[in-house]
Amino acid sequence: MTVKPELNEITPYLQFNRQEWGNFRKDTPLTLTESDLDKLQGQIEIVSLKEVTEIYLPLSRLLSFYVTARQTLQQATYQFLGKPEPKVPYIIGIAGSVAVGKSTTSRVLKALLSRWPDHPNVEVITTDGFLYSNAKLEKQGLMKRKGFPESYDMPSLLRVLNAIKSGQRNVRIPVYSHHYYDIVRGQYEIVDQPDIVILEGLNILQTGVRKTLQQLQVFVSDFFDFSLFVDAQAQVIQKWYIDRVLSFWRTTFKDPHSYFHYLTQMSETEAAAFAKHVWNEINKVNLMENILPYKNRAQLILEKAADHSIQKVYLRKI
């Protein structure tokens, strides 16, 4: 284990390289096969069994300890009260930029955590479902701010998190379609008292100025039991974003019903230039203003290299 405070300053994080972090796997068995892993891959990010073994297995072991400890604490509370209360899920928040690999991280963690005996029921929720509809964003002049904090129906997201954390059953989650680039009206996914909820989103660690004591403001991160930030250099993420757009340009965008079908009328060079423009004018701005400044609020940071491999792990001391 190495602890390397930057600029000789005291840091709340412990820093580990791949080998050091991988040692924390101990005797945790690898429960995923190559076939399982194929189903979890992202559009441009390929996660190897080596990555799972060295990074995600130790992380799932740590999280399993945390979840079990929280369950034990809940049981102590129930024993004190003398009656059982509704099961309260453990909520993990995963934040980071567009195209940094949040969805892949969420899927891999769900697969691993659901194989631990004490918490087999794991659900993933994305904040995409809480974006305002395109019609509303157009009306408010916010289409070019899609993904920024003001483009989300935050009251609805907070109500859903409150319901989940209160142990409510059959909580409805709005469905978002990346194919249509919009909310799917009338469609919902149901979250019914899982053991763990993984919430994935861009701005979920963001806070604002607290209101007066009479009007206390609640933030999304207030509901988290654990938070994780997926990090990489901005220039690296830009390349990943362009690669992702081009991957869709070659495949799903060819569907005439796709929102971005018009991009297929462009050459590959033009499509890449379009993606770079969107990155510079929208996604990079959002990263610098609303995502990156809150990185150090996370309890764990996964730092990626240009090949998508995680090279460093930062774990908050407490």
Swiss-Prot record:
Residue positions binding ATP: 96-103
Keyword entries, A-Z: ATP-binding, Coenzyme A biosynthesis, Cytoplasm, Kinase, Nucleotide-binding, Transferase
- Signal peptide span per the entry? none
Mind listing the GO biological process terms from this record? Answer: coenzyme A biosynthetic process
The pathway where this protein functions is: Cofactor biosynthesis; coenzyme A biosynthesis; CoA from (R)-pantothenate: step 1/5
Report the main location listed first in the record.
Answer: cytoplasm
EC number(s)?
Answer: 2.7.1.33
Q: Which SUPFAM superfamilies match?
A: P-loop containing nucleoside triphosphate hydrolases (SSF52540)
Q: Which family does it belong to?
A: Belongs to the prokaryotic pantothenate kinase family.
Name under which the protein is recorded: Pantothenate kinase
